């Protein structure tokens, strides 16, 4: 049956920009894909659900209506500057980073903001820092990306990333098990709720200050959008942390951007990264009516 899509929710890293062996040009979305996302966002909401923090995503996804960061820990609803002019109480905080928008740095501002469990976040941020220092000392090949909540600048997660190693698949097989043992020793030595997200095939390990998953995060986006049962959601993702979101979407598409990544995804379809732009262009041209993958890809 044809399905009319009302909302698109997408992961960022590995989905809208390829994981590849090396980091892309500033981890940016390729221009042709970004253009179609802007076109779509003028008609229906496009939302981002990412493990990245808002500091990283802010400039890169200005087409998005909702940006759910650090696996749903921090959620932003964005409004265009025009709607801001018409709505006096839209500002989040006086003197906040929001005011940068007025100087033309962004095409939108934050209109709603939610943060999960600030108590746990504060309690565990010091532990994350200690763990980060420990890994940095023991495994010099790994690059560690700290992720901070945007409003208070509290360390909320760390991402251990070794995709810059040319044959990272060997590192994954031979060295990553030792990295995980080191993390486990640290986590078990202290009372804490740190949450370790591992990946079967990706060159990452993510560690969060609390248990988070994209199933809960997508529910929060549905709630913010006030979705009715009739409104159908398309979800795009590339790794096993997207599986809970794939299961909650009406149509789900897994993206492959590196032949070394063969993770089993719970998505309805799988496409190559270079097929995503033509797929979205066709969906846009057909007024967001999806009718079987083969027809959409022609």
Residue ranges and their predicted role:
Residues 5, 43-44, 64, 71, ...:
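Short, well-ordered alpha-helix to beta-strand connector turns
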Residues 10, 49-52, 236-238, 255:
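Short His-Asn-centered micro-motif
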Residues 6-9, 66, 233-234:
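Hydrophobic "anchor" residues on beta-strands that sit immediately upstream
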Residues 4-23, 218, 246:
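Asp-based phosphoryl-transfer active-site loop
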Residues 3, 208-298:
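Mg2+-dependent phosphoryl-transfer enzymes with acidic/Ser/Thr/Gly-rich catalytic loops
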Residues 129-234, 240-248:
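Conserved acidic, metal-coordinating active-site core of Asp-based
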Residues 19, 28-147:
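Active-site phosphate-binding/coordination module
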Residues 16-26, 202-209:
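Glycine-rich phosphate-binding "P-loop"
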């Amino acid at each position: 049956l044809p399905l009319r899509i009302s909302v698109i929710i997408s992961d960022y890293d590995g989905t809208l920009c390829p994981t590849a062996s090396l980091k892309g040009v500033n981890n940016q979305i390729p221009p042709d894909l970004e253009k179609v996302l802007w076109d779509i966002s003028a008609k229906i909401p496009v939302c981002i659900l990412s493990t990245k923090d808002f500091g990283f995503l802010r400039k890169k996804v200005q087409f998005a209506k909702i940006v759910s960061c650090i696996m749903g820990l921090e959620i932003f609803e964005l409004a265009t500057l025009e709607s801001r002019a018409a709505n006096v109480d839209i500002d989040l905080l006086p003197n906040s980073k929001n005011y940068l928008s007025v100087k033309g740095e962004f095409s939108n501002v934050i209109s709603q903001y939610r943060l999960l469990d600030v108590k746990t976040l504060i309690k565990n941020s010091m532990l994350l820092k200690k763990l980060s220092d420990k890994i940095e000392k023991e495994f010099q090949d790994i690059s560690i990306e700290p992720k901070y909540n945007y409003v208070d600048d509290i360390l909320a997660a760390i991402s251990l990333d070794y995709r810059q190693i040319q044959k990272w698949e060997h590192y994954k097989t031979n060295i990553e098990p030792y990295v995980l043992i080191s993390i486990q020793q640290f986590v078990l030595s202290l009372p804490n709720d740190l949450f370790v997200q591992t990946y079967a095939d990706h060159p990452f390990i993510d560690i969060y200050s609390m248990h988070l998953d994209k199933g809960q995060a997508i529910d929060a986006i549905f709630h913010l959008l006030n979705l009715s049962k009739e409104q159908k959601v398309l979800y795009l993702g590339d790794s096993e942390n997207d599986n809970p979101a794939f299961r909650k979407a009406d149509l789900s598409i897994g993206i492959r951007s590196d032949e070394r990544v063969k993770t089993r995804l719970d998505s309805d379809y799988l496409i190559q990264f270079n097929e995503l732009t033509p797929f979205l262009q066709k969906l846009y041209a057909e007024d967001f009516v999806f009718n079987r993958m083969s027809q959409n890809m022609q």
